[in-house]
């Protein structure tokens, strides 16, 4: 398990302007402190936008350190076409403080930042063709493991890629890289012989019935158990952009130790990171 750093973040001030009924802008000043004795590179900063009460639908944002703009990303995490979080990456020297200015707007922006992460989910279609999809749901009794290309969503930074199996295993399978770059859009997790000869990475582990590099499992008192039976399974892509990529695996009605559980495993990878953050969310206390 990667030891996470402690970053202290404070929202100092906000200035709200609303020129028209459909137009709004809000400026925030954010103070960040690195209290560790080591430098931090590509440290994620995440702002919960729902707590800001902006008063308008946030459609774009810019983040500034002095006169330097920092790539940022707005993410809708619940599928309601509203941005829930703003994320950006910063470099922080040891025992240092920095101030950032964030401008939120109700106006759309055509601004594009260089991609540092990517998430992919594909489904097979007619004549062996496949389409990019953002999610897929099926009854727990259905075998859709081979319906989805590379058996579930794939997620990557420049340093590593993973895929999450779309079945009762929900195994996390790694794809190792030789060069620092995004590759999954080109290789789809299965590089050709020519691509491997040109320095592309490859599926690095035969996971069988294991947890791969790490996966949540049940426990029957003597051994780990897969996530079954369930009423319904869904896997989806939530974000893919310059700062982070997010995918989810959701099960409804998991029969486990006398309970019916609804669970979401949310996987987040940031640019410049090999580690992947996994949040396990239940709809009620266990």
Annotate each language-model stretch with its function.
Residues 1-27:
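Bacterial Sec-dependent N-terminal signal peptides
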Residues 22-24, 76-83, 147-149, 236-244, ...:
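Short, ordered beta-strand-loop transition motifs
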Residues 22-128, 138, 142, 150:
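Alpha-mannosidase-like glycoside hydrolase catalytic domains involved in N-glycan trimming
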Residues 99-103, 248, 277-281:
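Residues within well-ordered beta-strands of beta-sheet-rich folds
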Residues 101, 106-228:
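Solvent-exposed N-terminal domain segments of exported/luminal and surface proteins
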Residues 133-140, 250-258, 277-279:
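Gly/Pro-rich turn-and-neighbor structural signature
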Residues 195-272:
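Extended, loop-rich substrate-binding clefts of extracytoplasmic carbohydrate-active enzymes
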Residues 263, 274-286:
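Acidic (Asp/Glu-rich), glycine- and aromatic
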């Amino acid at each position: 398990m990667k030891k996470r750093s402690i970053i202290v973040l404070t929202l100092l001030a906000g200035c709200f302007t609303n020129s028209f009924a459909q137009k709004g802008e809000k400026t925030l000043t954010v103070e960040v402190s690195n209290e560790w004795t080591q430098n931090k590179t590509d440290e994620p900063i995440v702002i919960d936008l729902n707590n800001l009460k902006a008063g308008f639908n946030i459609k774009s944002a810019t983040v500034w350190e002095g006169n330097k703009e920092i790539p940022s990303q707005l993410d809708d995490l619940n599928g309601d076409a509203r941005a829930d979080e703003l994320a950006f990456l910063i470099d922080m020297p040891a025992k240092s403080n920095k101030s950032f200015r964030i401008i939120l707007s109700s106006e759309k922006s055509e601004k594009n930042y260089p991609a540092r992460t990517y998430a992919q989910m594909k489904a097979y279609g007619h004549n062996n063709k496949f389409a990019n999809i953002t999610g897929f749901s099926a009854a727990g009794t259905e075998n859709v493991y081979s319906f989805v290309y590379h058996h579930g969503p794939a997620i990557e930074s420049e340093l590593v890629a993973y895929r999450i199996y779309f079945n009762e295993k929900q195994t996390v399978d790694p794809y190792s890289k030789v060069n620092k770059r995004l590759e999954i859009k080109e290789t789809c997790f299965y590089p050709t012989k020519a691509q491997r000869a040109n320095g592309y990475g490859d599926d690095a582990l035969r996971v069988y019935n294991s947890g791969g590099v790490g996966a949540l499992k049940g426990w029957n008192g003597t051994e780990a158990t897969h996530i079954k039976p369930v009423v319904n399974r869904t896997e989806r892509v939530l974000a893919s952009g310059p700062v982070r990529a997010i995918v989810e695996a959701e099960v409804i009605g998991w029969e486990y130790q006398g309970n019916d559980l609804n669970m979401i495993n949310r996987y987040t990878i940031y640019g410049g990171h090999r580690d992947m953050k996994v949040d396990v969310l239940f709809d009620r206390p266990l």
